[in-house]
Amino acid sequence: MAEVRLGENETIESALRRFKKKIQKAGILPEVRRREHYEKPSQRRKRKLEASRRRRR
């Protein structure tokens, strides 16, 4: 879990920027979006196969 502690004389905006950067680096946001709805196992296999094809090109 990404955690950001507010430093002395640090604005909320800068702490929020650091938090967003940590979230993006950890890859949490895409994971949350992917898990938003149930994905059937066949759809998951199809998505992974397409991703591997794109990587091979």
UniProtKB/Swiss-Prot annotation:
Domain of life from the UniProt record: Bacteria
Keyword Ribosomal protein attributed: yes
Biased amino acid composition, Basic and acidic residues: 32-42
Pfam families noted in UniProt: Ribosomal_S21
Gene3D superfamilies: Ribosomal protein S8 (1.20.5.1150)
PROSITE patterns for the chain: RIBOSOMAL_S21 (PS01181)
Region ranges (Disordered): 32-57
Composition bias type Basic residues, residue spans: 43-57
Alphabetically ordered keywords of this record: Ribonucleoprotein, Ribosomal protein
GO molecular function, one term: structural constituent of ribosome
Keyword Ribosomal protein in annotation: yes
Gene Ontology biological process terms from the UniProt entry: translation
Any single Gene Ontology cellular-component annotation: ribonucleoprotein complex
Assigned protein family: Belongs to the bacterial ribosomal protein bS21 family.
Protein name: Small ribosomal subunit protein bS21
Species whose genome carries this gene: Synechococcus elongatus (strain ATCC 33912 / PCC 7942 / FACHB-805)
Biological classification of the source: Bacteria, Bacillati, Cyanobacteriota, Cyanophyceae, Synechococcales
Gene: rpsU
